[in-house]
Amino acid sequence: MTMSIRIGNGYDIHRLVSDRALILGGVHIPHELGLLGHSDADVLTHAIMDAMLGALSLGDIGHYFPPTDPQWAGADSLVLLNQVNELIRAQGWRIGNIDSVVVAERPKLKPHIKTMRDKLANVLQLEPNQIGVKATTNEKLGPVGREEGICAYAVVLLVSSDPVN
């Protein structure tokens, strides 16, 4: 059976620490804490990449960019996102739309959402209106609510570029 659309979902969480930049959707967010990770720890971009890969049953970002590989240390997640986008395009698919949510108690992310959407759209060769980015809190519940980390969820709709796919 052939399908012309595929849907994937993604999730990522990283711990908040001092002496690290806070980068979400490729945007540097002013904050006294940043996210700890092997790359730049951009949870939003990581969740989107996992959703893209998951839609095509291609595994997760750890398979392509393992945290044990020194070449990805400090990597810009937008560069990795571009590589994942090239991979799905080579498989005959393109993004129809993305919906995502970042969960953080602080800082307030609303002032940065348009810039996040614009940066992601530029890398993915999409229009900003194809990318939804929302922000919410965890109402002080769990590790995100205690400000121990930030997480993100993403859903991606892929559309076949090939009518026989």
Curated annotation (Swiss-Prot):
Chain positions recorded as a divalent metal cation binding sites: 12, 14, 46
Highest rank taxon of the organism: Bacteria
Biological-process GO terms, alphabetical: isopentenyl diphosphate biosynthetic process, methylerythritol 4-phosphate pathway; terpenoid biosynthetic process
Assigned protein family: Belongs to the IspF family.
GO terms of molecular function: 2-C-methyl-D-erythritol 2,4-cyclodiphosphate synthase activity; metal ion binding
Residues that, per the record, bind 4-CDP-2-C-methyl-D-erythritol 2-phosphate: 12-14, 38-39, 60-62, 136-139, 146
Functional pathway: Isoprenoid biosynthesis; isopentenyl diphosphate biosynthesis via DXP pathway; isopentenyl diphosphate from 1-deoxy-D-xylulose 5-phosphate: step 4/6
Manner of cofactor binding, per the entry note: Binds 1 divalent metal cation per subunit.
Record's keyword annotation contains DNA repair: no
Role played: Involved in the biosynthesis of isopentenyl diphosphate (IPP) and dimethylallyl diphosphate (DMAPP), two major building blocks of isoprenoid compounds. Catalyzes the conversion of 4-diphosphocytidyl-2-C-methyl-D-erythritol 2-phosphate (CDP-ME2P) to 2-C-methyl-D-erythritol 2,4-cyclodiphosphate (ME-CPP) with a corresponding release of cytidine 5-monophosphate (CMP).
Cofactors, names only: a divalent metal cation
Name by which UniProt lists this protein: 2-C-methyl-D-erythritol 2,4-cyclodiphosphate synthase
EC code(s) of this entry: 4.6.1.12
HAMAP family: IspF (MF_00107)
Sites marked Transition state stabilizer: 38, 137
Gene3D superfamilies referenced in this protein's UniProt entry, alphabetically: 2-C-methyl-D-erythritol 2,4-cyclodiphosphate synthase
Catalysed reactions listed for this entry: 4-CDP-2-C-methyl-D-erythritol 2-phosphate = 2-C-methyl-D-erythritol 2,4-cyclic diphosphate + CMP
Tagged with keyword Repressor: no
SUPFAM superfamilies cross-referenced by the UniProt entry: IpsF-like
InterPro entries registered for this protein in UniProt: MECDP_synthase, MECDP_synthase_CS, MECDP_synthase_sf
Subunit structure comment from the entry: Homotrimer.
Gene from which this protein is expressed: ispF
Keywords: Isoprene biosynthesis, Lyase, Metal-binding
